[in-house]
Amino acid sequence: MRGNLRRPGPAGTAGPGRTGIRTSADGGRARPRTGAGTGVRAGVRSGVVGVGAGIRTGVRWKISAAIALVGALVALALSLVVHNAARVSMLDNARDLADERIQVAERMYEAGRAQSFGVKLDDPAIPRDLMMKVTQGRRATYVADGPHGVPDIWAAVPLKDGRVLSLHTRFTDRSADIMKDLDQALIIGSIAVVFGGSALGVLIGGQLSRRLRKAAAAANQVAQGERDVRVRDAIGGVVRDETDDLARAVDAMADALQQRIEAERRVTADIAHELRTPVTGLLTAAELLPPGRPTELVRDRAQAMRTLVEDVLEVARLDGASERAELQDIMLGEFVSRRVAAKDADIEVRVVHESEVTTDPRRLERVLFNLLANAARHGKPPIEVSVEGRVIRVRDHGPGFPEELLADGPRRFRTGSTDRAGHGHGLGLTIAAGQARVLGARLTFRNVRPAGAPGDVPAEGAVAVLWLPEHAPTNTGSFPMLPLSGG
């Protein structure tokens, strides 16, 4: 049997050690003692909540789970502290009561009166540890583990005639009920703390998650060319926190990148503009040369240089996001058929479904001609053009587009060919993509392979697809569109 002995001393101090002995001189009053061990352990059952794979692991749920976990740990720790403190306090009160009763019984015995409180003389059931302290001539109390975990309270005092007067009581039912009620209240309070912490975490995490989603959406708009969008304005709020700092940093980065891009665009445009005059003069001078093969070479290279300068200027204008589309209503199939026939009569045009569209004919022609030129330069005949509703497809039967172009899209001065001589400058598809953006259209590229063939099988051709918008927008990304008055 394991128990706690307490022998009241003259000053009411607790004895050292785990035995919890408290002694007192005859006639002394034992004071309540805090922190004494009772020899009883409180068992706490903890539950583990499984999180399924289907639950979204966003910021709000992570914050909610963290707050709930911390709240559960704090509630558990406080519950244990309160439970043990309450139990120790009630046991101390029971000991003090037993000590007072044994003193009264001692005085009644010495006065020759009848005993009360269930006091016994020389009770053989007195715990051995308590008996050892009593034989030292001091009064003492003792707490032992009783059946079903209910403590037994003992008090004993040595008499002048050498006998031992003892008192044995059980922890009262009322005290046990109080402990049960306390434990129940602690459990309910802990559950309330966990649920309250979870709700608070969802609220806080939801606000943070919404701001982050707004920041991500604004950043995507900036990436798509929306120069007027600011992440800081998108997330809103008046409190400056880490999200606000992140938004300001993204805005600063976007501004710095935009300034650098704008500076590079201006330099490119200025250089191309300055080259336009001497190149025009060179082309004019070449026309004055006498006929012959050298003259043809000079004229061809001068014309190529002039085309390059014009293309560079066009790319610079498209990068400046200041281009406007002059809209007209046209029959797309008829328009494509006439333009392709004027460009190359050998190219087959198939109109699957005619459709009336509102677009800029000049820019659409530029996109179409650049796609045809790319197919003729890098692909193999036959070149096929099809029109189906608002969709234009240009296909060749060459080796297909380079993987870099399929992954990253057209890039200026990158042709995908190791030998750039006679293969253009990589500006044709770049201009086509830029003009498509001005039109509010979408330009995609893919390679044609046999059905079910793996990716390492050589392509049997390349297809460029231009998807014109169903409705003519007033503002497409960073390229506004202005309709022509009078059609």
From Swiss-Prot:
It is a multi-pass membrane protein. Residues 270-472 form the Histidine kinase domain. Its EC number is 2.7.13.3. Residues 206-262 form the HAMP domain. Pfam families: HAMP, HATPase_c, HisKA. One of its GO terms (cellular component) is plasma membrane. Its main location: membrane. It is found in: Cell membrane. The keyword Mitochondrion does not apply. The chain crosses the membrane at residues 63-83, 185-205. Residues 1-41 are annotated as: Disordered. The modification Phosphohistidine is found at residue 273. InterPro entries: 2C_sensor_his_kinase, Cell_env_sensor_kinase, HAMP_dom, HATPase_C_sf, His_kinase_dom, HisK_dim/P_dom, HisK_dim/P_sf. The keyword Membrane applies. Keywords: ATP-binding, Cell membrane, Kinase, Membrane, Nucleotide-binding, Phosphoprotein, Transferase, Transmembrane, Transmembrane helix, Two-component regulatory system. SUPFAM superfamilies: ATPase domain of HSP90 chaperone/DNA topoisomerase II/histidine kinase, Homodimeric domain of signal transducing histidine kinase. Residues 1-11 have a biased composition (Low complexity). It catalyses: ATP + protein L-histidine = ADP + protein N-phospho-L-histidine. One of its GO terms (molecular function) is ATP binding. PANTHER family: SENSOR PROTEIN CREC (PTHR44936:SF9). This is Sensor protein CseC. The lineage of its organism: Bacteria, Bacillati, Actinomycetota, Actinomycetes, Kitasatosporales. The gene is cseC.
